[in-house]
């Protein structure tokens, strides 16, 4: 299905999304803090619940790229898998911000300081499938957290689930360096079963700057379901 169908075709409403008015579930400081010395040329492989304080690196991380990739099983008879990278911009109470566009996805690719690139409708090819560009200096001050998720478009209707998705990952890239420097990567190792979405990561504003946390929380939800849970 093309972009027109995605925008106006009416994705299914599933029943197992988080409850409405759910505040931010996971503080950025819950989990294991990891550190990185970019001068030593390192790159972090994050485990679930690991978080990286971006202000503690040896470079000023102001312009980053959040990239996601995956492999899916193909079928001669089934529909192509269409996985979508999206971001939910939350205020300090854990709800979608009203100060700027609070949902960045294939239908509205920009918000202040955030932009998605092209929408990969099939996931074909090697490397990153979709990318989100973040300029922390331009993020609206009311935005306290950015939840990064990947959702299978119309997954339930097509009987497509994360249990059929392999080698899924999200990675953080410093765009200010030339060549670009991969800072951290989180490989999704758990079986997704019948889930149709995954909260991959959280970017959270703290008094000292931003943190990046590997989440890896599976959901039986559409983009609309997740959006409703943050209202």
Which role does the model predict for each range below?
Residues 2-145, 149-231:
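Intrinsic-disorder/low-complexity signal
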């Amino acid at each position: 299905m093309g972009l027109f169908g995605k925008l106006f075709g009416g994705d299914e409403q599933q029943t197992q999304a988080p409850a409405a008015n759910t505040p931010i579930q996971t503080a950025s400081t819950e989990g294991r803090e990891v550190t990185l010395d970019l001068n030593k040329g390192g790159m972090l492989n994050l485990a679930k619940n690991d978080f990286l304080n971006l202000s503690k690196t040896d470079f000023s991380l102001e312009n980053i790229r959040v990239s996601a990739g995956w492999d899916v099983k193909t079928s001669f008879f089934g529909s192509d898998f269409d996985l979508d990278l999206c971001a939910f911009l939350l205020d300090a109470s854990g709800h979608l911000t009203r100060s700027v566009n609070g949902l960045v996805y294939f239908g509205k690719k920009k918000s202040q300081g955030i932009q998605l690139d092209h929408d990969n409708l099939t996931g074909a090819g090697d490397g990153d499938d979709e990318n989100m560009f973040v300029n922390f200096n331009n993020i609206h001050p009311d935005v306290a957290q950015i939840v990064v998720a990947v959702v299978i478009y119309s997954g339930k209707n097509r009987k497509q689930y994360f249990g059929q998705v392999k080698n899924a990952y999200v990675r953080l890239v410093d765009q200010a360096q030339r060549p670009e420097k991969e800072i951290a990567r989180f490989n999704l190792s758990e079986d997704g079963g019948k889930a149709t979405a995954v909260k991959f990561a959280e970017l959270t504003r703290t008094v000292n700057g931003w943190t990046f946390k590997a989440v890896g929380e599976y959901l039986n939800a559409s983009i609309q379901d997740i959006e409703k849970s943050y209202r």
